[in-house]
Amino acid sequence: MCSSDLGRGACQQVVLTGAEAALSALPVLKCWPADGGRFVTLPMVNTVDPETGVRNVGMYRMQVFDDRTTGMHWHVHKTGARHYDAYKRLGRRMPVSVALGGDPVYTYAATAPMPDNMDEYLLAGFLSRRPVKLVKCVTNDIYVPADCDFVIEGYVDPAEEKAVEGPFGDHTGFYSLEDRYPLFHVTALTRRRDAVYPATVVGIPPQEDAWIARATERIFLSPIRMALQPEVRDLTMPEVGTAHNVAVVSIDRRYEGQAVKVAQSLWGAGQMMFNKYLLVVPSGTDVRDSDALARLLRRIDPVRDLVRSEGILDVLDHATATPGFGGKIAIDATTAGAALNPASQSESVPQLSLPEGCRTDLLEKWGAALAFAEPGAGVRTPEGVRYFVLFDPAAAELMPEELLWLAAANTDPRRDVRTEGATLVIDARSKRPGEGGNPARFPNVVTASEATVGLVDRRWTEYGLGAFVESPSRRYRRLLLSGGAQW
C-alpha cells in the first residue's frame, strides 16, 4: 500500500533551507483568545522507531515559538513519545518530518487508532484503494507522501531541555494548560508551487473533528468485532463526548456479566483506553436514538448495573487529580428493557420534593433532575429521581446536549459519581483547584472574544455563510471562571 520514489515529489517543487526555511511564511492560526501562541493544528508528524525502523504518523499540535522552532505536543501515551524515549535512551538526535495537506485520507490516517508498529500510510492506501507514493525528505531520511502541500523537515534533540507549551483551546471544549514538551527544530521547508495550507479549529462540540470521530466509529467497528469482541453489534462516540468521554456500544448478550467483559476489554484496547463513561445496551437498540437510550437509562438500577473501574484517561482530561489517570464507569443496560413490564410501567413524572431552582425538563425523558449551585455547596438529594446532576449556576440555560458535554468533561467518576439510595448523584460542577482531591489546576471553557464575534457578525453576508447564526460563544461565556485559560 506504499511505494517509495528516489526522485522528487510535488511537495518538493519549492525547497527552502537555512534562514529561508521560515515558519512565518505559513499562515499559522492563533485559534482562541487565551492560546499561548499560534499552532499548527493539522500536522502529520512522521517519525521512525530507531530500533525497528517502523514509521509512525501521528497528529500532535505544534506551537510556533519562532521561525525555526516549535513545540511537539507528544502525550506520554502516544507512539511519537515512545519513539522520543527510544532516541533518548540511545543518545541520538531524532529526525522528524511534518507533512501538511495532500490527500485528506493522510490526515485522517494520522488520527486513526492504529495498533502500535503499524504504518498509518498502509491504512491510507487501503482506504483510498491505491498505494501512497512516498518521497525522501531533503535534510533527513524520512519518507513523506509525494503529493502533500507542505513538508516541514527537522529534528528533536532528546538531550535538550523541554520547553513550556500552551495553553491551547482544545477539542475537549476547554483549554489544555501549559506543560513542558520537546522542541522541534526546522531544517527545511518544502512545498508545492500551488500549496494550500490546511488548518482546523477545535473547541466546544460539535466542531470539524466530530466527523473524524464518526469515520473512526465506522472504519474500526469490524476490527473490534473480529479481533476483540465478536458480540459487539454497533458502537458510537457521541459528539458531546469529544471522542473519549462517552461511548455507547450494543452487544449480543448471552450470559451474565457479558457487559462487564466487553467494557473491560474495550478499556484495554487502543485509544478506547481513554473512555470514561460507557453505556452497554442490548443488540437491536439504535445506539444513536436518544429516545431508545433514555428508556433504558430510566430503568437501570444504579447500584446493580454500574461497573466501576479506574485506569488511563486522556492527558487532556482536566477533571482528574492525577493527570492521565482516573475513574471509569460502565452502565450495564443490557437487561434494563426487560426489567419492567412496559404495559405496567408509568412514564409520568412523579410528584417530587425538589430543591429550589431545579430544572425538570429532562425528568420525563431521562429521569434526571438538575440542580445549580456554587462549587462545594451542599445540595439535598431528592428521593424518587433516577439521576440527580449538579452544575454551576452559569450552566442553568444550557441545552441538554451541552449539559451532557459539561457533565462528562467535568467529572472524575471516582470522586464525582455516587449512589444515594436508588439515585445516581453526579457532581458536574467546576472543581476548585487543589481542594478535596480536586485537580491542581482547572481550565476555562473555550470561547471567542467579543471582538472576533462582532467582526464575524458584521461581515457575515460578505463571507457567504447563508442564514445568520448567533455565535454560541456569547452563551458559553457565562461559564468562564476567570479572564484567562484557567481558574
Question: Where on the chain are the PLM-derived regions?
Answer:
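Charged, compositionally biased interaction regions
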Residues: M1-P33, D103-W487
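Internal mixed beta-strand/loop scaffold within catalytic domains of large alpha/beta enzymes
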Residues: Q13-A99
